[in-house]
């Protein structure tokens, strides 16, 4: 099979291309302009200019500057014009604009591109500056690409576009263009290794054989061109300078200058730091801490040392560093052959770090220990534990890339538990169920209590995702019994056990359980897990302020070496808090952060929860396309676990509700009514779907079903004394009373709902209850009472930025007629209700949709419509829409 290698092209720069092409398109109106594109060498500035030129017509004028031509006046202009420029820069400017205009239309946008503009000769830059000043009306955009800005470039270009390294998706696309299809985890490794530099990534893709791209734990070298540059730079350095460079390379990014100086044997390293900076190898920070110009420079320096000298340096470095993990990793790097004693020492350290919750460190240490282990059984066990720690750290992509390796090993309870763990994070409930059952069946809890406890903790997470509270508590207690309360498995189980209690409706016990867990865990990476669980509980328990305080502190997985998965849960529930308390913009920003973690980690379990909040936020704003997009994103792969399925269904149901398609609401949410016994889906405090379903039943006139459906949910919420759940259900019950014409029932129920919400910062729930109350009173004919509530609801919606519901409240107010000035309704005397119906029908809504939004029957809408036709002299909805579209004459 022949693989065609394509030129890398302009990959991953769509945003920059859109920005530049839009600026070019504005030049006929705004006049000439210049933009400076800045980026480090190798980031693709040239490719960006080439991609921009490919998108425009007529052809752009292009030039590239060179350092050797800086002293040659007009060298860049000569390329742009295709001939020698005039000797005067002002005259040259006029020629440049005329050449750019060509023979086309005078107002057609023209493009001038100069690459490496920081190396351009002064004469050419003067001519470009004069062209922009003297021909301000010309539709010309000059794009100057440079590695660094200069005063003159800054004077020419008012705006700057900075380009950074490519993201993982773009690097993966680059790989495909070079004939390589990388696993997402390997693309992540390559992106991190090269800092997203297209030049360096392409070089490695071309230089390394296919086998090197098979596993994400492979050690990638520096590209040949970087090694050559570094070797040349080191050749010009003195012995002490080189010694410091090698020490920095051996010790890694987190070493202090003092440690590097000690390893290099230097008493005063600052002269060496200056020399390395002058050679272009390092940059100096304010605290005199040298930092490699790019990460690949350090890799290249290490390669110049050779295996023997590098191993000796690592051996010495083990005595210089001051933490046990760094010491162990240096000893491993100094040991090329199996070493049972060192392997055991590293494995014990890995277990300790895992027990403390530092899973990423534990994963690396277990992998090192496996390499040093000669016994195949123990070697495989340590490799499996490395993958388990990767999953615990939230590195789903890295773990997934190693699945073929793990599956090739002999079956053990640990192996099956690890594969189940990864399946849970990927949202594969059936696979996880099968693997967990198999692991539990073959483990001997008497001989391997620690392994049995680990399997039990995976059952805990599985039960959490299935929303089975009692089952979760049972498995958590089993894990604690097997391994002990203070063991890693015990702490992990305790960190989730409180959520199981909450899902079973035992909120007081849940709070007590978390208070105890927080006291036991102290200050370690495990704190992240307990704090997140406690914040999650606070969200469910109507304590949003407490939830925000806790969740905001655990959204960064780098703190204390915590887990990406835990950070994603924290972000998802923090976004929920922000939405409920009226911070829509903050909620969308938090969702975006969660999406980014989901992309890099490969964890699918939390995505629907994030997208549910995004969907509701977009709906409030009337952003239908965005709401539909995020609802679809929530649905992707959300069929396995309830914790994925319920948010996806709620997102779709709320879109249908906003469209007044209550039949669709019932169809979407109907599967949730079939929840088995023991499921948290029957807990109104956990998932707010019951009130939406009941309200849809009422809207469809199925009052007896609505009553029967609401009763057990109301009883449950009342028994648990859960305020917001009772208020939400009371909203549906109030609508039910309204549909039956029971005005006293409407008032009593809605007043009780507002009383329950009093003192809670749940602005979204208060707005919904107030709006529904006003609708019910307006339908009951209590227009003046309804006006006060609807006005309040409108203001509440406005404070939430909910433009769609502000409009709905305004329609309700107009339909009520209280605010309509009598005797000033225009030449045709439509009632306020008729005006509202006419407006909505003219906008394209069906009778059923109008009825749902105005809380009347479709027959009532048709009655109003018949009177409207007669008064306006039209015969159809089409004629009514055409009349509405006619311009209104000013008096």
Located regions from the model:
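Conserved adenine-nucleotide phosphate-binding loops and their immediately adjacent elements
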Residues: 1-22, 169, 221-228, 820-826
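Short secondary-structure boundary elements
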Residues: 38-43, 51, 119, 170-372, ...
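Tandem amphipathic alpha-helical repeat scaffolds
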Residues: 42, 300, 349-351, 383-393, ...
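Conserved phosphate-binding/catalytic loops and adjacent sensor/switch elements of nucleotide-binding enzymes
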Residues: 43, 47-110, 119
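Alpha-helical sensor/transducer elements of the RecA-like P-loop NTPase core
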Residues: 47, 75, 123-189, 193, ...
């Amino acid at each position: 099979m022949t693989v065609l290698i394509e030129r890398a092209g302009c990959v991953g720069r769509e945003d920059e291309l859109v920005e530049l092409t839009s600026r070019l398109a504005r030049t006929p109106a705004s006049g000439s302009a210049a933009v400076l594109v800045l980026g480090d060498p190798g980031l693709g500035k040239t490719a960006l200019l080439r991609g921009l030129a490919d998108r425009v017509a007529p052809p752009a004028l292009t030039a590239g500057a060179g350092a050797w031509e800086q002293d040659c006046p007009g060298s860049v202009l000569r390329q742009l014009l295709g001939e020698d420029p005039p000797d005067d820069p002002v005259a040259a400017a006029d020629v440049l604009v005329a050449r750019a205009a060509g023979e086309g239309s005078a107002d057609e946008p023209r493009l001038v591109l100069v690459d490496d503009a920081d190396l351009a000769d002064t004469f050419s830059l003067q001519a470009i500056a004069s062209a922009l000043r003297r021909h301000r009306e010309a539709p010309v955009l000059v794009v100057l690409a440079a590695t660094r800005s200069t005063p003159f470039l800054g004077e020419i270009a008012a705006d700057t576009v900075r380009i950074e390294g490519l993201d993982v998706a773009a690097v993966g696309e680059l790989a495909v263009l070079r004939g390589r299809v990388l696993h997402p985890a390997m693309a992540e490794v390559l992106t991190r290794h090269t800092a997203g530099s297209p030049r360096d990534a392409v070089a490695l893709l071309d230089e390394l054989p296919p086998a090197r791209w098979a596993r994400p734990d492979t050690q990638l070298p520096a590209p040949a061109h970087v090694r050559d540059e570094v070797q040349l730079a080191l050749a010009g350095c003195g012995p002490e300078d080189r010694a410091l460079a090698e020490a920095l390379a051996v010790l890694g990014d987190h070493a202090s200058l003092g440690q590097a100086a000690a390893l290099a044997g230097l008493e005063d390293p600052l002269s060496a730091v200056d020399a390395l900076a002058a050679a272009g190898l390092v940059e100096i920070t304010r605290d005199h801490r040298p930092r490699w110009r790019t990460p690949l420079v350090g890799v290249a320096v290490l390669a110049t040392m050779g295996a023997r000298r590098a191993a000796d340096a690592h051996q010495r470095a083990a005595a210089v560093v001051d933490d046990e993990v760094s010491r162990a990793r240096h000893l491993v790097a100094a040991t090329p052959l199996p070493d049972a004693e060192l392997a055991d020492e590293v494995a014990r350290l890995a277990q300790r770090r895992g027990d403390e919750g530092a899973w990423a460190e534990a994963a690396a240490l277990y992998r090192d220990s496996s390499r040093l282990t000669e016994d195949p059984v123990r070697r495989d066990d340590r490799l499996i534990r490395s993958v388990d720690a990767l999953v615990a750290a939230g590195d789903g992509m890295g773990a997934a890339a190693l699945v073929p390796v793990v599956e090739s090993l002999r079956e053990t309870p640990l192996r099956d538990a690890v594969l189940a763990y990864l399946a849970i994070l990927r949202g594969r409930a059936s696979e996880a169920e099968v693997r967990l059952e198999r692991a539990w069946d073959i483990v001997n809890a008497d001989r391997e209590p620690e392994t049995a406890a680990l399997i039990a903790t995976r059952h805990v997470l599985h039960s959490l995702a299935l929303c089975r509270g009692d089952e979760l508590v049972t498995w958590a207690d089993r894990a604690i019994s097997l391994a002990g309360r203070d063991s890693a498995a015990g702490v992990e189980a305790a960190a989730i056990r409180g959520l199981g209690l909450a899902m079973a409706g035992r909120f007081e016990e849940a709070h007590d359980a978390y208070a105890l867990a927080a006291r036991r865990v102290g200050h370690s990476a495990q704190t992240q897990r307990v704090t997140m669980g406690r914040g999650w509980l606070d969200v469910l328990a109507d304590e949003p302020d407490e939830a925000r305080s806790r969740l905001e502190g655990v959204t960064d997985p780098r703190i204390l070496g915590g887990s990406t998965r835990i950070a994603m849960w924290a972000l998802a529930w923090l976004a929920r808090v922000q939405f409920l308390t009226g911070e829509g913009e903050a909620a969308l920003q938090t969702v975006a952060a969660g999406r980014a973690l989901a992309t890099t980690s490969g964890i699918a379990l939390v995505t629907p929860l994030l997208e549910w909040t995004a969907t509701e936020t977009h709906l409030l704003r009337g952003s239908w396309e965005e709401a539909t997009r995020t609802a679809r994103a929530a649905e992707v792969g959300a069929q396995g676990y309830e914790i994925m399925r319920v948010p996806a269904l709620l997102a779709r149901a709320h879109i249908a509700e906003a469209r007044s398609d209550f039949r669709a609401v019932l169809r979407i949410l109907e599967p949730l009514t079939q929840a088995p016994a023991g499921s948290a889906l029957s807990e109104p405090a956990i998932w707010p779907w019951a009130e939406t379903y009941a309200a849809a039943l009422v809207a469809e006139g199925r009052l007896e079903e609505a009553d029967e459906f609401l009763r057990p949910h109301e009883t449950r919420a009342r028994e648990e004394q859960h305020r917001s759940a009772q208020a939400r259900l009371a909203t549906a019950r109030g609508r039910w009373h309204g549909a039956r014409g029971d005005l006293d029932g409407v008032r009593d129920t809605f007043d009780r709902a507002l009383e329950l919400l009093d003192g809670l910062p749940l602005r979204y729930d208060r707005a919904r209850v107030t709006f529904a109350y006003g609708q019910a009173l307006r339908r009951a004919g209590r227009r003046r009472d309804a006006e006060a509530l609807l006005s309040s609801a409108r203001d509440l919606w406005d404070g939430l930025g909910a433009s769609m519901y502000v409009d709905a409240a305004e329609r309700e107010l107009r339909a009520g007629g209280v605010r309509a000035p009598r005797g000033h309704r225009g030449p045709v005397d439509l009632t306020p209700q008729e005006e509202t119906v006419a407006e909505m029908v003219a906008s394209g809504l069906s009778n059923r949709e109008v009825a749902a939004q105005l809380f009347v029957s479709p027959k009532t809408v048709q009655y109003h419509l018949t009177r409207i036709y007669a008064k306006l002299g039209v015969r159809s909805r089409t004629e009514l829409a055409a009349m509405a579209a006619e311009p209104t004459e000013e008096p």
